[in-house]
A protein has these predicted regions:
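Intrinsically disordered, low-complexity proline/glycine-rich segments
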Residues: 1-194
């Protein structure tokens, strides 16, 4: 795998909603597709596989739920080629009533940061009729410093998230951040019934 795929200062995650399953594309700042996944339906444990493209031949990394039937659990992000965990993501169940928040963990399970939705927007999105039309604005902190911002843009048959990660430190593998964004999109889909 070309490790330079995961050093771009800009990414875009595109989500298209289809009848049976959502599809997600990861693109760099120039619009080149770097990854693709399709959400599986009726699963006991999340096992999200990110491929190089829609042919789903070359697997790049996996987002693997560590506990069965645990929607609030910890997810390992595994580099498929090396079979190595590059980091983990854990949902903060206590904040999920106000706004989405995930903790970013190193491969050993130590918290190094968080991805969180602005609480005012989160409240609007979750509890106000038609609140889902309020675009998400998500912030990323690593080691106590804000290092990235993610902005949602609505499209006719899906959404897009622009990820500005030029200031991400080397302690955080960008695949972990991108995996967190895909998880947030999938969890939101289940919550909203989309």
């Amino acid at each position: 795998m070309n490790r330079n795929l995961w050093t771009s200062p800009q990414y875009k995650i595109r989500k298209k909603v289809f009848a049976l399953a959502n599809q997600y594309w990861i693109e760099d700042g120039r619009g080149t597709v770097l990854g693709y996944t399709r959400q599986k339906m009726l699963r006991l444990r999340e096992d999200i596989r990110i491929y190089a493209d829609e042919s789903m031949v070359q697997e790049l990394f996996v987002i693997h739920q560590e506990q069965v039937l645990d929607a609030w659990g910890t997810f390992a992000v595994v580099d498929t080629a090396r079979n190595v965990c590059v980091g983990k993501i854990r949902r903060n169940i206590m904040s999920s009533f106000l706004a989405d928040e995930y903790f970013l963990l190193d491969p050993f399970g130590q918290t190094i940061g968080r991805v969180y939705e602005e609480s005012g927007r989160g409240l609007l999105r979750k509890y106000i009729p038609m609140g889902g039309l309020v675009p998400e604005r998500v912030r990323v902190e690593v080691l106590g410093q804000q290092v990235a911002e993610i902005r949602q843009q609505f499209r006719v048959i899906g959404d897009e998230w622009d990820v500005d990660c030029a200031r991400i430190p080397p302690q955080l593998d960008r695949r972990v951040l991108l995996a967190g964004m895909i998880l947030m999109g999938m969890v939101e889909r289940e919550r909203d019934g989309n």
